[in-house]
Amino acid sequence: MTKLPKCVKLVFDTRLTRNQKRRKNNMRKKYSHLKEMIEDCAVKYENNIAFKVKKTGENGKISYDEITYARFAKEIEYLARSFIETGLAGKRIAVIGKNSYEWIVVFLAAVFAGGVIVPLDRGLLDFEIADQLKRSEAVALFYGAEFKDRVADYDIVKVCTEDKEFSDMLVQGKEADNKKEYDSIKISTHDMTVLLFTSGTTSASKAVMLCQNNITFDMYAMSIWENFYETDVNMALLPFHHTFGMMQTMLFLSCGMCNVFCEGLRIAKCMNEYGVTIFVGVPRIIEEMMLAVNKKITAQGKTKKIQTAIKLSNALKKCGIDVRRKMFKQIIDGMGGKLRMVIIGAAAASPDVLKFFNSIGVLAIQGYGLTETSPVISAENHSHRRKDSVGLTIPGIEARIDNPDENGIGEIVTKGENMMLGYYKEPELTAEVIKDGWFYTGDLGRIDKDGYIYICGRKKNVIVLSNGKNVYPEEIETIINLSPAIKECIVYAEGDDIRCKIVADEEFEGDANESIAQHMSYVNEQLIYYKRINSYTVQDTEMAKTTTGKIKR
């Protein structure tokens, strides 16, 4: 056998083992299915707190329900055995509602009972809920209390996860004489287990079929790509119905950490209350955290002082001296005092946001993926970050650029065990995106010589001018959104004229229109002639968005 050059071996070893050497528990396990994972965690992390849930009594008294991994595993089993008793085992069960402990129990119980779970977006309109229930062929719906009136007329089994009926099902399963039947349920690793609808209008949403191997593979790859500890506390803010929200929760459970929920938008209060160490959120929420900190700094007249401190700490870090968390302790204390990592999902993050958190000693990373890839394809980690990129492919994933242009930009295609089974009952649509074992993402990007991926935008959004030149709207929007006077924008074309709609930030202090005008002149100076903005309009109303916060084009 031909020996690999030493330099190649070194690169390979660094990619796959650096995180493991730093981790106390350095042997992560690749689980065959989720039941194996939960049962293993119930033993390994038996008395660890899996979920800490705030409860408000009738007298207004606050208490906390600390649910251990052992209890969590038992309650999943009890609900799954209740499904056997009620004829729901092996069936399709939908769940809708805010992030909650009960939501996760329903999700896993449906899977453990040999069925298919159908997570529904809680931002859907009534007719969209009805449509997706019909398309998924769900026979039961578990819902949060806020949906009680909205789902009352649906002719399927309905259970409110916040009513006594749900807790009665746990008791029913516990007392049922069907333990052997439950234990004998065969868990398939490669059959459809999760049916997820992509965001968009009802007519455009696609039902994505995922198997357990898709999820456990992505979990495992992420667990060896970044450092996660059983002592971590995760604030589960990203919606569970979103693939990344679902996968990262399963990932964090596999690592034995504690998971907590945020009430409303009181993020800073919750982070302080629970001692949150890891926070996963959409870009807008992370950006608002940064803006809130900057607003306090400005009000205290400390802007120049902080900027100088950041320059000093960055210089020291280059010399191997990291004093960021000590130097910016007051800022970190304002976010609970223990925050060590911010993970940004669902959309691309502003470079300013990533730079801010990393400058104060909180690791801020982002990745790239789709519902169809369970979802992570690439990600940054503590030692692999590069400006404007979405990181390297996570272990076990391949990616390449299809039909690149003169700038190396083309469609990103990927291959790995995280790739979906297909679109439910849409074989022709599936064949359009899965070819010869490769998934065609519909995203345009490039990959540099070191393997870092850079996203330019969606293939369907690209503007092709009459001279044959391509303009990528998202690329220009990233530059435009750097202005503090601009909240959001959308770039589009009318003929060969590149235009832009801008939403001004109402909290901007100063003349927003003048600031925007100056910034747009700067933007055009940075762009090649055919990409320049010919005209723009400023509006007060926000753009229409999907439930994951992406602007609808």
Sequence positions of predicted segments:
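AMP-binding/adenylate-forming catalytic core of the ANL superfamily
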Residues: 141, 416, 421-422, 444-529
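Conserved AMP-binding/adenylation subdomain of ANL enzymes
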Residues: 216-233, 240-328, 338, 363
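Conserved AMP-binding/adenylate-forming
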Residues: 279, 323, 327-453, 459-462, ...
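Conserved AMP-binding A3 loop
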Residues: 66-70, 193-219
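Conserved C-terminal "lid"/linker of ANL adenylate-forming enzymes
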Residues: 488-490, 521-553
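Conserved pre-ATP/AMP-binding loop-to-beta segment of ANL
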Residues: 46-49, 176-197, 204, 227-233
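ANL superfamily adenylate-forming
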Residues: 61, 146-189, 293-330, 540
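Conserved AMP-binding/adenylate-forming core of the ANL superfamily
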Residues: 30, 47-100, 104-108, 125-130, ...
